[in-house]
Amino acid sequence: MQNTDNPLRWLPSLYFFKGLPYVVLMVVSTVLYKQMGLSNAEVAFYTSWFYLPWVLKPFWHPYVSRIATRRWWILLTEIIIGASMGSIAFTLPSPFNLQASLALFWVASFSCAFHNVSADGLYLDEMGPRHNLIYFIRTTFYRLATFVAQGILVMVAGNLQVMYRGSMGYSWSLVFYGLSLFLLLTWIWHGIFIPYTQPAFKQLSIPGIRQVLGEVSDTTKLFFRKPYAIYATIFMLLFKLPEGLLSKVSILFLIDGAHRGGLGLSPQEYGLVAGTIGVAGLSLGGILGAKAIAHGGIKRWLWPMALSLTIPNAAYLYLSYYMPDNIFIVGLCVFLEQVGYGFGFVAYIMFIKRFVMGYLHKAHLTLGKAFMALSIMLPAMFSGFLQQAVGYRTFFIIVLCSSIATIIATILAIITLKAKEARK
């Protein structure tokens, strides 16, 4: 029996693993497929489907711990993710790279969603109400994974393309082979150090489809019986509409050629701007948002956070008009937009947590997060088609106009919060 009393043996690597494939799925895949020659409409549509496991989370989340232990799920999903990344590396130089890689990314996305749930569950089971240092370590390594995936991996791919004279498939293949090797080594590490809590199948209970649908139906009915549930749902679906539209197109705009209206950043420049400067801005915004909510409460900060989520999007409109060559200016614009998003996103999460408090709060929180994934998935799927139809500049104007949806959602959220306070 190994000594697992020290959570620092497995917690940092667990949350690094949690973040790494997620960012590869949502961000790096977008850069990859753009470099493979797909249109913006195709890239946005295909990669947005990777959100589906999180949209379907209410259907499978309650049953993960019933089937097996969290440790078992973590180790199973980690080897699947690692093998999937290695298989993607194998297929990228081949003639059938698109179909094969999409199928493998699809497998990895479901495994990643299951891994996220199991990792969070294990953290809560093992850590309990510990001091802030443990939470800080967890958050730091998740952010570090974002930096490595969105920054370093993309930079390495760009450098390999220079070495191999623009061979996109082979260069990205080497990146994914390296990623796969790292993930599989981490899987071995976790197999040694993640604590055993009980036999893997101590309470084996596989629910039938009818039982699953029945329980999800009951949970959903109780959710919508909450006062102002419709207002809250509209908030969850509309508050992040501008970000949903930007999530894919902002990446494509940065790396698309100038003849198509993009900035034409190289992978190395993109890794610096989005993967380093942007991630730093997102982290800073999140820290400031959490401190603001802690000191002033969500009702006080909801409007400022809604504005911070929308107004900084004008940075992309500025970039599309002036097309600066100075990487510092591009980095500053991305930094400001990400600070605003990180700051505003805190209000979104805190509203969901506040609204679902009470009976079945865990199940209702899962449902709320499914709405959150859906609020990004749907606009992102069609954002590429819209951008191709109107061009980048007009698209960013449309994004700013979509801020009206955020304003409406904020008004409904304030009404809901006031009504909730009045009932206390």
Q: Where is each model-derived feature located?
A:
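Helix-loop boundary and gating motifs at the non-cytosolic
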Residues: 2-54, 230-260
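C-terminal transmembrane helical hairpin of 12-TM major facilitator-type secondary transporters
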Residues: 300-347
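Transmembrane alpha-helices of Major Facilitator/SLC transporters
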Residues: 52-57, 270-294, 305, 309-312, ...
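Intracellular loop-helix junctions on the cytosolic face of multi-pass helical membrane proteins
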Residues: 1-5, 38, 82, 92, ...
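Cytoplasmic membrane-interface "Motif A"-like loop-to-helix N-cap segments
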Residues: 66-80, 294-308, 327
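Helix-to-loop junctions at the C-terminal end of transmembrane segments
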Residues: 56-69, 284-301, 387-388
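C-terminal ends and interior cores of transmembrane alpha-helices
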Residues: 75, 79-96, 307-325
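Transmembrane alpha-helix termini and helix-breaking/packing motifs in multi-pass membrane transporters
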Residues: 62, 89, 148-170, 291, ...
